[in-house]
């Protein structure tokens, strides 16, 4: 299942420092797909794939001190237009 993850940074310098030092810190079972960052660098819009939102909460626990998270299950617009609904 795909998830749009919206990360709102409380302290972007701390986020980028931790990322450089430790990487994404994602648990096994979560696959990073792609991400885009707002031009001010304070918000990241990320697509991840995993079987359960619970895995995303495990990942977020490594960052919650400096980032607020929102998880939204998503499907491609192509899939939606073909099927009219989520499988």
Located regions from the model:
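A common structural junction motif
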Residues: 63-70
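Short S/T/G/P-rich N-terminal loop/turn motif that feeds into the first structured element of a domain
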Residues: 1-33, 37-43, 51-58, 75-87
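Conserved catalytic core of Hanks-type protein kinase domains
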Residues: 49-50, 62
């Amino acid at each position: 299942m795909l998830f749009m993850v919206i990360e709102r940074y409380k302290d972007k310098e701390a986020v980028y420092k931790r990322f450089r030092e430790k990487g994404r810190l994602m648990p096994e079972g979560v696959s990073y797909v792609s991400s885009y960052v707002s031009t001010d660098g304070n918000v990241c819009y990320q697509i991840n794939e995993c079987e359960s939102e619970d895995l995303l909460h495990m990942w977020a626990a490594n960052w919650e001190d400096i980032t607020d998270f929102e998880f939204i299950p998503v499907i491609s617009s192509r899939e939606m237009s073909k099927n009219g609904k989520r499988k």
